[in-house]
Each structure stands twice: as structure tokens, then as C-alpha cells.
């Protein structure tokens, strides 16, 4: 690039060579975007449109011709002075005036006064001109910032002012010049760089980072970007050397908040999903997120809250923060926002207590209120649950898997002392046992609310099992493996039953068994409630308990949101 830039510069110099040679320390370069020559003063490390060979007023004219060299403007296509004209500028070059010299010396200060509003205005225009900006403005802006560290303020100010006064057009040429100057200076080894403001950007870095910025800058960073420019200037000098990274950092502030919503890859998956669906919720929880640092911290928490939030809509994620809420996030009904926030608190509890699932059970059961007490005691319930599961097996011979699963549960009940991971698995399997009974008792179609709820809870428990960290312990790993196998078997059985049994006739008969299992599982609670309420289903009582049970898992406090919950999972079951 440097060669190319230099040669054009030389040509320009010769072209302008009509005039005397440039003063020492000056260099002419051609703006690759506009084709206009601009001048680099290596002495002051600035660039200008004005020809130093013309009376020194030139630079001072700059303020008046902040948009373009006033003198040069005449020499160069007057269009430059007619800011709107800049036809030669690439569309993107709108925003950053490079009038570092004039701007820096005189205008910086005035501009600085305006810059903020100017920048905003400018930003807005830039946003409008985003397509144009995309090419150079980004480059211009990032580079301006880089070169402008010293001049950055000037550039920002100049940019702000021109945008304010002349709008993008003026900034365009300056931006272009800025870009070109920065690029050329970048291309010029140290001289160019130094001229630009001693940004020492690697030569290659000139325009690339800008592109990144454009994405962020246009939407998120525009307002903040000017702030970022000013705020980050000091850091930028060092940072800008690594152009792209700097931008990310700068936009880190701008960026981070955004990413929280959509940008961060994983977060976006987890929170992005939730952010999209529950962006309000997310914003509520992650309000901290705006600051990048906090964002990270929040991210951890938010994920947990998210899991819970999601849990409500998608019980699958499991209340365990570990469970992958990300996928579920999208499913979150907007209504869950409050839940999410509340969830956070709950989250911390579950997180701290590996047996949170039991607590969740309690919450779940609480809505039905049938057997909240049993869930609290996971150990005992686990033991009884195994016999119950056996009974279930007896009732439903097809459920051989339950029989297999049953033994592990007693063993796991003994295991609690072994390892928190085993305890977690045990607690999950307790729930699964209740769900298993519900499956055995289930009679209906796949569209029934009961079916959907059981399936959702089973999936949630599956995710919970996945989220258990074996920490390299074989016993935990084995317990988890067995639990996953069992849950999968139960899911298969449920599918078969739903297909095979269109009617819900047996539900009444099975009610007693459901009641028995209620203690171990919310699912059982649901089953019992369903069976009892089947007659009242028209009244919608069944929906309320079901939704409540789901919600408790997601958020016990989210009782207000049951309607949304019912809508999401419950509607299918409405039939």
C-alpha cells in the first residue's frame, strides 16, 4: 500500500508541483478514496487538505474549511468545499473529517464542545449512511480514532462538527482523507503513523478494524462510539495499535450490552435466546450487563437465572443453573421476565445447594399443594419412591426400565454421603420416579396437556442429569449414565403410550398410584391433580395446577405469570 500511496502522492506532489516544493517534513499523499491529494506534516504529525505551500493561513483556514482544505478545495474539486458534493468519496466515507491539522490546532477545542452532540448527530447520519459508512466510515472512524489519538479529539470534534454543520458530506471527505491519511500514514511506516498521531498501527491494520466497528458502531455503538472515541482515546493510542481488538474493547462497552442480547456467541445462545425472547427479562436481570466486566459476571448469573426462567417455560433446562438454558431461552415467554429476576435469587440457592432440585420440587408441589412436605426430604422420598416405582412397574408391566431404574435409586439413596454429584443425580431420579409413575398412569394423546407436561419435565430432568458434573468420579458418572438411560426409557414409554392409548380412561384408576407418587414428584402431583381435575378440565382447573407446577420449577414466585405459562405449555393440553 505504501508504495501505491507514495507513488500517487508523488504524482500529486508533482501535479501540485506547479507550486514550489513542499516545506521540509511535509508530504503529499493521494486519498485513495477520493483521489484528492492531502498533505502530511511529519513535524506535527498531522494531515490536512490544505497545501502548506499556499500561505500558511491554509491550516488556519481549515477551521473555516474544516470539511476540506479551503484552499485546496479550490485547487481540488471545489466539490470538497461544497461538502455535499464530495461525489468522489466512496459512499461510506461520510463521517470522519481528517482535518487533524486545522481541527486539531484550532477546531479541536471548538469541536470538542460540539463533538458530543455533533457526534451523536453524526452518528445518526452515519447510521443512515451506514451502507456508505460501512466501507470507509468505519475505517475512517476507527482510523480517525487511531490517528487521532492526538488528533482523535480533533477528528472526533471535527467529525462531530462537520456532521453537525455539514452533515456526512463534509465529514465524508475528511473521513476519506482521514482514512486515507491514516491508511497512507499507516502505509508510510513510521512517518505516516507518526503524522497520524503516532498511532503506530501496524500498517495492515488501517481499514480492517473499521469494518468490524461498522457493524457495531452503526447500531449499538453509534451513540456510544463517539463516547468510546473520546473515552478511549487515551487507551486507544496503545490499544489502537491492535486495531480490531481496540474496537472490540471500545465497543466492549457498547458491544457487551449488545452481545448480551445477541452478540456474544454462547451468551447469545443462552442469553441471546433468552434475550431475544426475554430480552426485557434479560435486561432486567443483566441490567449489570451494560458494563462488559459485569456482563461477564452477570453472564454467569444470568445463565443461572436464565435456566430458571427458562425452566418455567421450558422446565427441561432444569432449575440447575448448570442446565443449558441457552437452547431453552428462546422458548421463554416474555411474561417470564419477572420470574427470571426472581429466579436469580432462587438460582443462587440452587447453585449453592446441589440438591436444589428437591427445593424446586417443593416449589413445584407447592402450587399443586398436594404434597409439598415429602419433596423436602429427598432421601426418604427417594427410598419410598423406589417401592412406588416398583408398584408402578407392577401396574405397568411394559415399564421394565423403571424396574431397572428402581434399584439404582435405593443405591443412590445410600450414596448421598458419597458425593454431591451423586446426591444431585439422586434428587433428579426422585423426580424421575414420580414422572415414571405418571407415565405409567398416563392415558391420552400427545396433544394432552398431561403428556406435554410429563414430556417437558422428563426432558428437563434429562438436562439436569447432563448438567451434573461428575468431577472425574466414576460413581457419579455411572449414576448419571443410569439416570439418563432411565429417563430416555421413560420418554420412549411415554411416546408409545401416547400413540397406543388415545383415551384417558385409566387415569381415574391410576389416580391413587399418582397420589402415592406425588410425594416424590411434582409430576405425580400433576398427575393426581390432573386425574382429580379431569372432570373439571373444562373449568380449566387442571391447567392452573399444571402451569403452576411448571412455573414453580421455573420460579415459584412467578405465580403471577401462570397465565403465560399456561398459554405456552398448557394450551396444547387444553383439548
From Swiss-Prot:
The UniProt regions of compositional bias labelled Basic and acidic residues, in chain numbering, are: 72-83, 250-259
Where does this protein reside within or beyond the cell?
Answer: Nucleus; Cytoplasm
Omega-N-methylarginine-modified residues are where? 139, 261
Cross-link Glycyl lysine isopeptide (Lys-Gly) (interchain with G-Cter in SUMO2) lies at 445
Compositionally biased spans, kind Pro residues: 327-336, 367-381
| Compositionally biased tracts (Low complexity) | 155-198, 532-559
Kindly list the positions at which N-acetylserine occurs in this protein. 2
The record's listing under CDD domains reads: WW
Q: Does the keyword Cell wall biogenesis/degradation apply?
A: no
Record's compositionally biased regions (Polar residues): 132-148, 266-288, 560-569
Record remark on domains: The BAG domain interacts with the nucleotide-binding domain (NBD) of HSP70s and is essential for the nucleotide-exchange factor activity.
Q: How does it assemble?
A: Forms a ternary complex with HSPA1A/HSP70 and HSPB8, serving as scaffold subunit. Component of the chaperone-assisted selective autophagy (CASA) complex consisting of BAG3, HSPA8/HSC70, HSPB8 and STUB1/CHIP. Binds to the ATPase domain of HSP70 chaperones. Interacts with BCL2. Interacts with phospholipase C-gamma proteins. Interacts with DNAJB1 and DNAJB6. Interacts (via BAG domain) with HSF1; this interaction occurs in normal and heat-shocked cells promoting HSF1 nucleocytoplasmic shuttling. Interacts with HSPA8/HSC70 (via NBD). Interacts with HSPA1A (via NBD) and HSPA1B (via NBD).
Q: What name is this protein filed under?
A: BAG family molecular chaperone regulator 3
Q: Which organism is it from?
A: Homo sapiens (Human)
Q: Which gene encodes it?
A: BAG3
Amino acid at each position: 500500500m505504501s508504495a501505491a500511496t507514495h507513488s500517487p502522492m508523488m504524482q500529486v506532489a508533482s501535479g501540485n508541483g506547479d507550486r514550489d516544493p513542499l516545506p521540509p517534513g511535509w508530504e503529499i499523499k493521494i486519498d485513495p478514496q477520493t483521489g484528492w491529494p492531502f498533505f502530511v506534516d511529519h513535524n506535527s504529525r498531522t494531515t490536512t487538505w490544505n497545501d502548506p505551500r499556499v500561505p500558511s493561513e491554509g491550516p488556519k483556514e481549515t477551521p473555516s474549511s474544516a470539511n476540506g482544505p479551503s484552499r485546496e478545495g479550490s485547487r481540488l474539486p471545489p466539490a470538497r468545499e461544497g461538502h455535499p458534493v464530495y461525489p468522489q468519496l466512496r459512499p461510506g466515507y461520510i463521517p470522519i473529517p481528517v482535518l487533524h491539522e486545522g481541527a486539531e490546532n484550532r477546531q479541536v477545542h471548538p469541536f470538542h464542545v460540539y463533538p458530543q452532540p455533533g457526534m451523536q448527530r453524526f452518528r445518526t447520519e452515519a447510521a443512515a449512511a451506514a451502507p456508505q459508512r460501512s466501507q470507509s466510515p468505519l475505517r475512517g472512524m476507527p482510523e480517525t480514532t487511531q490517528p487521532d489519538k492526538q488528533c482523535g479529539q480533533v477528528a472526533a470534534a471535527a467529525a462531530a462538527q462537520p456532521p453537525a454543520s455539514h452533515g456526512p458530506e463534509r465529514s465524508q471527505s475528511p473521513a476519506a482523507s482521514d482514512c486515507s491519511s491514516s491508511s497512507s500514514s499507516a502505509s508510510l511506516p513510521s512517518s505516516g503513523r507518526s503524522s497520524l498521531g503516532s498511532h503506530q498501527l501496524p500498517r495492515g491494520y488501517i481499514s480492517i478494524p473499521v469494518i468490524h466497528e461498522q457493524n457495531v458502531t452503526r447500531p449499538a455503538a453509534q451513540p456510544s462510539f463517539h463516547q468510546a472515541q473520546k473515552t478511549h482515546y487515551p487507551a486507544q493510542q496503545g490499544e489502537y495499535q491492535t486495531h480490531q481488538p481496540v474496537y472490540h474493547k471500545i465497543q466492549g462497552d457498547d458491544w457487551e450490552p449488545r452481545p448480551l442480547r445477541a452478540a456474544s456467541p454462547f451468551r447469545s445462545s443462552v442469553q441471546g435466546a433468552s434475550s431475544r425472547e426475554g430480552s426485557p427479562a434479560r435486561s432486567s436481570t443483566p441490567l449489570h450487563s451494560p458494563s462488559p466486566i459485569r456482563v461477564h459476571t452477570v453472564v454467569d448469573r444470568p445463565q443461572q437465572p436464565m435456566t430458571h426462567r427458562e425452566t418455567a417455560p421450558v422446565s427441561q433446562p432444569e432449575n440447575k443453573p448448570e442446565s443449558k438454558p441457552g437452547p431453552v431461552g428462546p422458548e421463554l415467554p416474555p411474561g417470564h421476565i419477572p420470574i427470571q429476576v426472581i429466579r436469580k435469587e432462587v438460582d443462587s440457592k440452587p447453585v449453592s445447594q446441589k440438591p436444589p432440585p428437591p427445593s424446586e420440587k417443593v416449589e413445584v408441589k407447592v402450587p399443586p399443594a398436594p404434597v409439598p412436605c415429602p419433596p423436602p426430604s429427598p432421601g426418604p422420598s427417594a427410598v419410598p419412591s423406589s417401592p412406588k416405582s416398583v408398584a408402578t412397574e407392577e401396574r405397568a408391566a411394559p415399564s421394565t426400565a423403571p424396574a431397572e431404574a428402581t434399584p439404582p435409586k435405593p443405591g443412590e439413596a445410600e450414596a448421598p454421603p458419597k458425593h454431591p454429584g451423586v446426591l444431585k443425580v439422586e434428587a433428579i431420579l426422585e423426580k424421575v420416579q414420580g414422572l415414571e409413575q405418571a407415565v405409567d398412569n398416563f392415558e391420552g394423546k400427545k396433544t394432552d396437556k398431561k403428556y406435554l407436561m410429563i414430556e417437558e419435565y422428563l426432558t428437563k430432568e434429562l438436562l439436569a442429569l447432563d448438567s451434573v458434573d461428575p468431577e472425574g468420579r466414576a460413581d457419579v458418572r455411572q449414576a448419571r449414565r443410569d439416570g439418563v438411560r432411565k429417563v430416555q426409557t421413560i420418554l420412549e414409554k411415554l411416546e408409545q403410550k401416547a400413540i397406543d392409548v388415545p383415551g384417558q380412561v385409566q387415569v381415574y384408576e391410576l389416580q391413587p398410584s399418582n397420589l402415592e407418587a406425588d410425594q416424590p414428584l411434582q409430576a405425580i402431583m400433576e398427575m393426581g391433580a390432573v386425574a382429580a381435575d379431569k372432570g373439571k378440565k373444562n373449568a380449566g382447573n387442571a391447567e392452573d395446577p399444571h402451569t403452576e407446577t411448571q412455573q414453580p420449577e421455573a420460579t415459584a414466585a412467578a405465580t403471577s405469570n401462570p397465565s403465560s405459562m399456561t398459554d405456552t405449555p398448557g394450551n396444547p393440553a387444553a383439548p
